[in-house]
Amino acid sequence: PSRASLHTGLYACNHRSVTNGTPLDSRHTNLALELRKAGIEPLLYGYSDTSVDPRRVHAQDPSLDTFESILPGFKSVVDYNLGYLEGWLNWLEDQGYERPDPSESVFHHSPEKITAGRFCDEPAFYAAEHSDTAYLTHHACHTIRNYHNEDWFIHLSVLRPHPPLIAPAPYNRLYNWRDLPLPERGSSLKNDAAMHPLLELWQEKIDTEDYFGSQANMLRLCDEDILRAKAVYLGLITEVDKNLGTIFDLLKKTGSGMKL
């Protein structure tokens, strides 16, 4: 919903793409289409998570099976989302890593690091300079360096700090979990669920040991592990900040930052 609002300039009550999978009405123009009217080809690095208008495609069109389509108007340069990891995994191979199999295990800790029922905040097997965030940043910077006096537009859409909650060193333990506050909550899961039907439904949904590849039941973590997970989340935010700084520094170095 927020992404659709960003792309269209409309409130969710107007564009009505209010959940992942809710189609975005094709009658709405968007940022990418308007940029094309100005003679600029908008480039996408990452994902736009757009659900196509089913009235504009055949009933058997594969795009109807996903909410991870590209927003009309964008040229996808580097495609990356949880449903498509191949580009990043190929890049990891180029950096000398063994390719994870299956693909989603790139976000898993090795079995010897896992304690049953506990959240694991050990570092990912890849270095910070090879993370999914760094992968998108690297390719976006490569493109920026090739622009000189022409107009350009890049939409860099990184996944993080979205789960899976696993981070490369030092971001996995950049924040001390002991310094963090516990979330505001009821006295028990049962009491929380009784507050609203949505909370009850949500508890049922996440009552699993594979919610976003977490390798632990995120609903039933002890207080310490809740804070460890929170610390990893904050670390992922800081990792994004660091990579944005890399881009801003490049813009200053190339002079592009003066034109934004």
Task: Name what the model sees in each region.
Residues 1-260:
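Formylglycine-dependent sulfatase
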